[in-house]
């Protein structure tokens, strides 16, 4: 039996929800006058900006996870300096994006072994643990 990848998707959705809200709060604090232009849209490539415009997105919660991680990475120096974050958070954000891509773009008959699956869940957990949200622990407890 192979791992149920819908659990990974559920966790990735949690990351997207939390990261979007967190980015909005932190970026507004760093850029009180126009964070959307200077901190969000500036972080996206031309294709991503076109998608944002077509979708009518106006806050980080409305961006997909790869875009959120792009915004996070672009603003990392300011976030790190202003909020004195753990540097590991940067690596964890990149890893979560890679996990999302792996499961979203998985071939139909691709086999994901249990060890890799549990490692991916643990990586997402470590990233979400930064937010110290109680619902995360509840969701994760059902995976083990």
Language-model regions, residue ranges each:
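Amphipathic alpha-helical interface elements
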Residues: 1-144
């Amino acid at each position: 039996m192979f791992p149920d990848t819908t659990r990974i998707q559920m966790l990735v959705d949690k990351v997207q929800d939390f990261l979007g809200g967190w980015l909005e709060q932190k970026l507004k604090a760093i850029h009180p006058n126009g964070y959307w232009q200077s901190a969000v849209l500036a972080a996206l490539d031309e294709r991503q900006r076109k998608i944002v415009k077509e979708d009518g997105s106006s806050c980080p919660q409305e961006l997909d996870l790869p875009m959120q991680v792009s915004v996070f990475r672009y603003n990392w120096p300011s976030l790190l300096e202003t909020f004195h974050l753990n540097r590991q958070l940067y690596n964890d954000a990149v890893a979560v994006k890679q996990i999302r891509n792996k499961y979203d773009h998985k071939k139909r008959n691709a086999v994901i072994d249990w060890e890799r699956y549990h490692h991916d869940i643990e990586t997402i957990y470590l990233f979400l643990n930064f937010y110290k949200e109680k619902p995360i622990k509840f969701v994760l407890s059902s995976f083990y």
